[in-house]
């Protein structure tokens, strides 16, 4: 263990690191452009307020990956409830037009993925860094060219 990975409180020494993934409601491709910048700023600000360190993060169009260190006074579910709840309100304040897509002011889908980080921290950091590029490649692979049976010409949509 490296010293910088270990946190200290008055009577506690700790290293509580988690890989967390969560997505917008309906897994919509909503995190791009100005919204992506705002989501990043909002999540950084909220984490800072709770003393949560963001070690690595990536915002893909349809989900967020975060490698974070949470102080032991908070549970993962407390932090996720706080991040998703507060960030939803802040996102809707900055982007009022989203209320037409997400009428109930819930920007994030219910639930999230969480995994503890142990000795595989470097692999998880690399995985998070590569996610955006892998998503782009997967999107390009999934683009199908359809041939019109009557004309024989290629169509890009079904």
Where are the language model's segments positioned?
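Basic nucleic-acid-binding interfaces
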Residues: 1-158
